[in-house]
Amino acid sequence: MANHAPFETDISTLTRFVMEQGRKAQGTGELTQLLNSLCTAIKAISSAVRQAGIAQLYGIAGSTNVTGDQVKKLDILSNDLVINMLKSSYATCVLVSEENTNAIIIEPEKRGKYVVCFDPLDGSSNIDCLVSIGTIFGIYRKKSTDEPSEKDALQPGRDLVAAGYALYGSATMLVLAMDCGVNCFMLDPSIGEFIMVDRDVKMKKKGNIYSLNEGYAKDFDPAINEYLQRKKFPPDGSAPYGARYVGSMVADIHRTLVYGGIFLYPANKKSPSGKLRLLYECNPIAYVMEKAGGLATTGDKDILDIVPTEIHQKAPVVMGSSEDVQEFLEIYRKHKAK
């Protein structure tokens, strides 16, 4: 009879992983405190998302946020959870949220050395129809010795210490990117811990799926439309790419990370700067993509090289498998040279 224990007794949890990385880096433990607090917020949001219908958390709260999106009740709850947990970590000094017009400066007695930019509930327009939604975050180290201010958040994505997202889907998955690579953790509700399920994730160099909202095609740059035409009707006679678009960035990005392919949210005539926000959507996801061997670009430059000028700045994005993004860039540069 096989000697299988009914329970794993040496579990690789997110907390354990982060502590190990901190020990290797001979850190102070502040980043571990921060990530543990963020995890608690994510667990609470995951629980709220699953109870939303019963707890009457669906629907609109009756206002719009700074970027013009209608604010849902779950948005407000999620935002408050993340802010309160990060404040209580004693590891942050400045917080930037999609839901707040201005940066949040942490009170002096609770300050640490990190700046966190986050979207507490990405894809919240999909809440009422039960489509997967998520939380996105990027963590920077405060560089100046001055009093904390909004300027501390205006760092390029290359300066990220850690970034990632939580996906509230058929299970709750947390994807964390750090210098050591990209690792995936799944929430085990029976013990309330994130368990490592994929270590040092690497993307396929080329996929067979493209993802964007083609409803805006009439306003796209000609380079986008030429690229899409190539994917649908390959000139070499190969199989066309499949089209997949959920409309929840975290869901579309996670599929791209797992299966390969390309995700596009380009600029168009109505949104010449794109629609996704640089600090708490584009940069964290671009960081994950690059650490997993993919690419992330605006067309003109790498997303992680953009130096932000304001906290709710927007950027067009094309990201995914390296060969797919390179193929797009060849077409984009050809059109730009005309």
From Swiss-Prot:
Keywords: Acetylation, Allosteric enzyme, Carbohydrate metabolism, Gluconeogenesis, Hydrolase, Magnesium, Metal-binding, Phosphoprotein. Substrate binds at residues 122-125, 213-216, 244-249, 265, 275-277. GO terms for cellular component: cytoplasm; extracellular space; nucleus. Binds 3 Mg(2+) ions per subunit. It catalyses: beta-D-fructose 1,6-bisphosphate + H2O = beta-D-fructose 6-phosphate + phosphate. Mg(2+) 3 binds at residues 119, 122, 281. The modification Phosphotyrosine is found at residues 216, 245, 265. It is an enzyme of class 3 (hydrolase). Its cofactor is Mg(2+). GO terms for molecular function: AMP binding; fructose 1,6-bisphosphate 1-phosphatase activity; identical protein binding; metal ion binding; monosaccharide binding; RNA polymerase II-specific DNA-binding transcription factor binding. InterPro entries: FBPase_C_dom, FBPase_class-1, FBPase_N, FBPtase, Fructose_bisphosphatase_AS. Induction: Up-regulated in pancreas by obesity and dietary fat intake and in diabetic animals. The modification N-acetylalanine is found at residue 2. PANTHER family: FRUCTOSE-1,6-BISPHOSPHATASE 1, FRUCTOSE-1,6-BISPHOSPHATASE-RELATED. Homotetramer. Belongs to the FBPase class 1 family. NCBIfam families: PRK09293.1-1. This is Fructose-1,6-bisphosphatase 1.
